[in-house]
Amino acid sequence: MSKNYHIAVLPGDGIGPEVMAQALKVMDAVRSRFDMRITTSHYDVGGIAIDNHGHPLPKATVEGCEQADAILFGSVGGPKWENLPPESQPERGALLPLRKHFKLFSNLRPAKLYQGLEAFCPLRADIAANGFDILCVRELTGGIYFGQPKGREGSGQYEKAFDTEVYHRFEIERIARIAFESARKRRRKVTSIDKANVLQSSILWREIVNDVAKTYPDVELAHMYIDNATMQLIKDPSQFDVLLCSNLFGDILSDECAMITGSMGMLPSASLNEQGFGLYEPAGGSAPDIAGKNIANPIAQILSLALLLRYSLDANDAATAIEQAINRALEEGVRTGDLARGAAAVSTDEMGDIIARYVAEGV
């Protein structure tokens, strides 16, 4: 008998409800094809939660997420709420507290150049022709963004500002394990990014990653300095499988990876804790300018569901089926407006219907 799973669904604002509806169509197809018992509960978050409950992250939403196996998150924010105090705005008042509450220490950002979309890649045509499929694994809760001391002091010519890069062994070990486990589900190569020729924190990072690698003899490990990595991503992104990064370096490289795909509408994201509980969301924003027009690209939201299946439910076959269905749709020329470039475009609903049908049929 299959296990029962429960997903907290937080559509949010802007295009969030529209693209979430498409992911739920695909979830229905997964249920049927793979005989998975998945139930869902919907909760307000972000601006809609401010309107309905007076807070971007209501207590009921947090409690609902605590009862779930994973969170499928849409997007939050919009002009309506941008004049609120920063801590009360949808982005800072909802997403960041969720990450903190559930101790989500790792961020996974896949970046893939799909066949047929090479023209959107800003790299040279001969580089884009090779394609790429990269997973950026970023440590989220340590490093220079959170290290102490930090601050400003002094005045005049003696005024200064300072931040501190701090990493503990356990923080490096657990993010390294995420990277190596992820590589086992992919092409079995990890490239660890550091600045070990200069920084003490990077020297420790490299030492510990080497130690963790000994328990993954089936996964290839390489090390690369951050400055070289930024260049190599432009020169030949196809050389990379899994990038393992500290908070700062991952912040930089995950955005670079996103940029070279050419479309934010294709990029999912996962944030995980040590128990495998995760929050899954599109990497793009709420796009209020196109909300309600049925033209948004739902693929990032659907791919976020695929990540949820793979990492929180350990349903790799179902995740792969979604990815194959998306590949098929794109190879057949199915495009939403952001990818059409003047050609015929399908609506948000139509794209969701097509992908769900392809999941149900199998490729």
From Swiss-Prot:
The record marks 145, 195 as: Important for catalysis. It is an enzyme of class 1 (oxidoreductase). GO terms for cellular component: cytosol. Optimum pH is 9.0. Optimum pH is 9.5. GO terms for molecular function: 3-isopropylmalate dehydrogenase activity; magnesium ion binding; NAD binding. Disulfide bonds: none annotated. Signal peptide: none annotated. Binds 1 Mg(2+) or Mn(2+) ion per subunit. Substrate binds at residues 99, 109, 138, 227. Pathway: Amino-acid biosynthesis; L-leucine biosynthesis; L-leucine from 3-methyl-2-oxobutanoate: step 3/4. Inhibited by p-hydroxymercuribenzoate and N-ethylmaleimide, but not by iodoacetate or iodoacetamide. Its cofactor is Mg(2+); Mn(2+). Keywords: Amino-acid biosynthesis, Branched-chain amino acid biosynthesis, Cytoplasm, Leucine biosynthesis, Magnesium, Manganese, Metal-binding, NAD, Oxidoreductase. Mg(2+) binds at residues 227, 251, 255. It catalyses: (2R,3S)-3-isopropylmalate + NAD(+) = 4-methyl-2-oxopentanoate + CO2 + NADH. It is found in: Cytoplasm. One of its GO terms (biological process) is L-leucine biosynthetic process. NAD(+) binds at residues 78-91, 285-297. The keyword DNA-binding does not apply. Belongs to the isocitrate and isopropylmalate dehydrogenases family. LeuB type 1 subfamily. Catalyzes the oxidation of 3-carboxy-2-hydroxy-4-methylpentanoate (3-isopropylmalate) to 3-carboxy-4-methyl-2-oxopentanoate. The product decarboxylates to 4-methyl-2 oxopentanoate. Homodimer. This is 3-isopropylmalate dehydrogenase. It comes from Salmonella typhimurium (strain LT2 / SGSC1412 / ATCC 700720). The lineage of its organism: Bacteria, Pseudomonadati, Pseudomonadota, Gammaproteobacteria, Enterobacterales. The gene is leuB.
